[in-house]
């Protein structure tokens, strides 16, 4: 599939299958995350692949998204501002931008593997 088609076909899916994801597909997705660029190659991003039922239950408990309850896996992308590149002119820290780039690589790779995603930003940080 070419990139333009991939980008156009990717959407936020609300009907998540509980079917396990093949390890080859997960490896390809991980490689796409690793290949994502970061500002000045500082790499302030960390990615967690959550698959255990116990860990998935914890993830589900902090979000209001009911469709997530059938998901067999979840990628969590975070950044460490202390490790991000900071632009001198205005002190903008690029750690969150870098995390967004990595997350986008993950989502597009998932789509390329014939799977579906949704971006979840609505969660309880306190939990």
Task: Outline where the language-model segments fall.
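Acidic, surface-exposed loops and disordered segments
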Residues: 1-127
């Amino acid at each position: 599939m070419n990139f333009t088609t991939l980008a156009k076909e990717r959407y936020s899916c609300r009907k998540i299958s509980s079917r396990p994801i093949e390890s080859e597909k997960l490896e390809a997705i991980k490689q796409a995350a690793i290949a994502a660029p970061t500002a000045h190659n500082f790499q302030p991003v960390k990615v967690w692949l959550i698959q255990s039922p116990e860990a998935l239950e914890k993830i589900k408990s902090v979000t209001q998204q009911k469709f997530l309850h059938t998901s067999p896996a979840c990628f969590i992308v975070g950044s460490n501002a202390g490790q991000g590149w900071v632009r001198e002119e205005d002190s903008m820290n690029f750690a969150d931008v870098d995390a967004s780039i990595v997350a986008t690589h993950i989502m597009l790779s998932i789509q390329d593997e014939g799977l579906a995603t949704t971006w979840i930003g609505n969660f309880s940080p306190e939990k």
